[in-house]
């Protein structure tokens, strides 16, 4: 399947651009108000006690600001943040090298933390609980355990699949936050702030239109903003007005609901099943996508907005989906 403009994963070329648009202060971070409020209290209390923050877990679909909010936490705590991802920690020595280089109150951010191997988790447990590394030297009867004290640090775990975390690991996080999709008004404000940083003039209605099609996700909103800016430049316009915005979004294949070709193919597959549950493996084979992409990228927004139901037997289209696609729902008695 071709690259999706509404793909939730970070594209390689976007990394430096995303950093330049990332909010640096709480007042710059739009949305997630309840999470921000709780974090501000925890940070204030930790600073007054002169302690590190409790370990915390952020979970939810990609692109909602887990990394950005972690950078703000580090800045508010006046400490350093080390960013890594679970697939990069292959051996216990990899984790030991990271942990022993942390300073007191530093933050270690591990993305995709659900992908840590059980062996790595075993090394992480005493580090999280007692700020201690237990390193085994040698093997067999001659094996020895060396204990290395670590400075107090904060582990921030980020995951799109909280259900795949082992219970022992999940229980060691003192705080757990579910990142929510953003409202169109929040996304519109994010888009307008980003346009200022990009030195791009944008009309209010253009920002609103991009926000409406951004699937509740800032990462997608910023990606669409930059693509619409390209269309404006080609048309020799210094202003992103509604006409240019609508033309660009339509050319990009993103409809008024933020759906693209993959979303519509997914929903059509369910709707045409006429109430029969469709298994994830069947969907993946039909769409030529891996199951993880369907669960983490395609389904969350559709599920949150009532376009499908997940059951033990599979996925079922809702009446909302049938109405959208104009596919009538057959009487169940006619199916047999």
Swiss-Prot record:
Pfam families reported in the protein's UniProt record: AAA_lid_4, RuvB_C, RuvB_N
Keyword Nucleotide-binding: yes
GO cellular component terms given for this protein: cytoplasm; Holliday junction resolvase complex
Region (Head domain (RuvB-H)) residue spans: 256-336
Catalyses which reaction(s): ATP + H2O = ADP + phosphate + H(+)
Sorted UniProt keywords: ATP-binding, Cytoplasm, DNA damage, DNA recombination, DNA repair, DNA-binding, Hydrolase, Nucleotide-binding
Predominant place of localization: cytoplasm
GO molecular function: ATP binding; ATP hydrolysis activity; four-way junction DNA binding; four-way junction helicase activity
Binding annotation for Mg(2+): 67
Region annotation Small ATPAse domain (RuvB-S): where it falls in the sequence: 183-253
Keyword Amino-acid biosynthesis annotated: no
Disulphide bond pairs: none
PANTHER family assigned to the protein according to its UniProt record, in alphabetical order: HOLLIDAY JUNCTION BRANCH MIGRATION COMPLEX SUBUNIT RUVB, PTHR42848
Free-text function comment from the UniProt entry: The RuvA-RuvB-RuvC complex processes Holliday junction (HJ) DNA during genetic recombination and DNA repair, while the RuvA-RuvB complex plays an important role in the rescue of blocked DNA replication forks via replication fork reversal (RFR). RuvA specifically binds to HJ cruciform DNA, conferring on it an open structure. The RuvB hexamer acts as an ATP-dependent pump, pulling dsDNA into and through the RuvAB complex. RuvB forms 2 homohexamers on either side of HJ DNA bound by 1 or 2 RuvA tetramers; 4 subunits per hexamer contact DNA at a time.
Complex formation: Homohexamer. Forms an RuvA(8)-RuvB(12)-Holliday junction (HJ) complex. HJ DNA is sandwiched between 2 RuvA tetramers; dsDNA enters through RuvA and exits via RuvB. An RuvB hexamer assembles on each DNA strand where it exits the tetramer. Each RuvB hexamer is contacted by two RuvA subunits (via domain III) on 2 adjacent RuvB subunits; this complex drives branch migration. In the full resolvosome a probable DNA-RuvA(4)-RuvB(12)-RuvC(2) complex forms which resolves the HJ.
Protein's recorded name: Holliday junction branch migration complex subunit RuvB
